[in-house]
From Swiss-Prot:
Protein name from the UniProt record: Small ribosomal subunit protein uS11
Lineage top rank: taxon: Bacteria
GO biological process, one term: translation
Naturally occurring in which organism (per UniProt): Pasteurella multocida (strain Pm70)
Protein encoded by which gene: rpsK
Upper classification of the organism: Bacteria, Pseudomonadati, Pseudomonadota, Gammaproteobacteria, Pasteurellales
MF-aspect GO terms: rRNA binding; structural constituent of ribosome
Length: 129
């Protein structure tokens, strides 16, 4: 008995006007994730995934390229306003925000959500070069 062909349904792109850009800027890499207000990820990009390897991953330019790649994908959702949450001490903090602003998003507010311990775990020992 022949099976009837299964037709793939067209995926409906959801329209999102407001979003949140989560920027994780570590010393070695920068991760940009853009979500909707509920926290569902719409797109993400990293400096390493954008073609930068080794010490070039940890540059502000690599973070800027990652933000631009993420912004391209999210434009299809109709995103207009962004709230930015920055975490970490890395070199890509400021350049990522500038790139998102230059991509045409209206940045409503910028929040620093870097976790600061109230004397929690012992930090790693200092480097001796």
């Amino acid at each position: 008995m022949a099976k009837t062909p299964v037709r793939a349904r067209k995926r409906v792109k959801k329209q999102v006007v407001d979003g949140v850009a989560h920027i994780h800027a570590s010393f070695n890499n920068t991760i940009v994730t853009i979500t909707d207000r509920q926290g569902n990820a719409l797109a993400w990009a990293t400096a390493g995934g954008s073609g930068f390897r080794g010490s070039r991953k940890s540059t502000p330019f690599a973070a800027q390229v990652a933000a631009e790649r993420c912004a391209e994908v999210v434009k299809e959702f109709g995103l207009k306003n962004l709230e930015v949450m920055v975490k970490g001490p890395g070199p890509g903090r400021e350049s990522t925000i500038r790139a998102l602003n230059a991509a045409g998003f209206r940045i409503t507010n910028i929040t620093d959500v870097t976790p600061i311990p109230h004397n929690g775990c012992r930090p790693p020992k200092k480097r001796r070069v």
